[in-house]
């Protein structure tokens, strides 16, 4: 489903309804809003693990602007603060009150920015693998785990000079280190279903500057959200 808001078109999907039966009445369920990692991925890698929560919560998956199935823009619009505004406008448009926002990795920066600017909008905040410090990889430790070549790629990534080939090799060789007991199907589950669009995102310098962007983004006033009339019937939640 698509929704037009804050000057962009966002793709989202929903698992579970807002209400569940409790004896003779319908009881509201909490809303879990999931923000994927990246930049350059989409929400789909979360589906196998989080869809079962639809029995007890309404789970909303959102593709951040420029990623997955959401609309592409110029590089100047790929900023953490703007994406946080997108999420806040999305919640207002579809009528979500006090969602529990789960942000994974890069999505955690977006969720944290939203929480810092408008804490009253959130019912809860879950950060998954979102770094709390302003530094990049421990290159010495990475070299011990993955070798000198991967250390050099990580160094280029942090300065914004990594190539597409660098990123592909880094992802396939370093991501397995995140699992205690890695299985190859874990990566196929991510990259086999995810709509990857790294080139549409601002240069790799964004990866090296997340903390700087977080600290220095000015607060922006949300523009009124509008739903495209041709798709509005499919945009509202059940």
What residue spans do the PLM features occupy?
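Catalytic nucleophile-loop/oxyanion-hole region of alpha/beta-hydrolase
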Residues: 71-84, 131
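Conserved hydrolase catalytic core segment
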Residues: 97-140
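Conserved HGGG/HGGXW glycine-rich cap/lid loop of the alpha/beta-hydrolase fold
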Residues: 6-76, 90
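Conserved acidic catalytic loop of the alpha/beta-hydrolase fold
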Residues: 81-99
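Active-site acidic short loop of glycosyltransferases
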Residues: 7, 29, 92-98, 119, ...
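Flexible "cap/lid" loop of the alpha/beta hydrolase fold
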Residues: 123-158, 194
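Alpha/beta-hydrolase
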Residues: 155-221
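Conserved loop-alpha-helix segment in the C-terminal half of the alpha/beta-hydrolase fold
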Residues: 213-238
């Amino acid at each position: 489903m698509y929704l037009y808001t804050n000057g962009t078109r966002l793709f989202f999907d929903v698992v579970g309804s807002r209400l569940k039966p409790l004896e003779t009445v319908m009881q509201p369920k909490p809303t879990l809003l999931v923000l994927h990692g990246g930049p350059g991925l989409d929400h789909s890698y979360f589906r196998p693990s989080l869809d079962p929560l639809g029995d007890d919560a309404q789970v909303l998956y959102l593709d951040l602007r420029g990623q997955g199935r959401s609309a592409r823009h110029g590089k100047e619009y790929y900023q953490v603060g703007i994406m946080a505004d997108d999420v806040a406008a999305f919640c207002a448009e579809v009528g979500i009150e006090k969602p529990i926002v789960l942000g994974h990795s890069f999505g955690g920066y977006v969720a944290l920015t939203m929480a810092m600017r408008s804490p009253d909008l959130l019912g809860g905040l879950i950060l998954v693998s979102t770094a709390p410090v302003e530094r990049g990889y421990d290159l010495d430790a990475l070299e011990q785990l993955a070798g000198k070549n991967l250390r050099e790629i990580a160094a280029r990534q942090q300065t914004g000079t990594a190539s597409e080939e660098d990123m592909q090799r880094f992802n396939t060789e370093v991501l397995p280190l995140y699992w205690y007991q890695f299985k190859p199907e874990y990566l196929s589950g991510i990259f086999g279903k995810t709509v990857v669009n790294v080139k549409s995102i601002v240069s790799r310098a964004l990866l090296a500057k997340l903390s700087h962007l977080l600290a220095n983004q000015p607060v922006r006033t949300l523009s009124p959200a509008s739903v495209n009339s041709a798709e509005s019937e499919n945009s509202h939640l059940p």
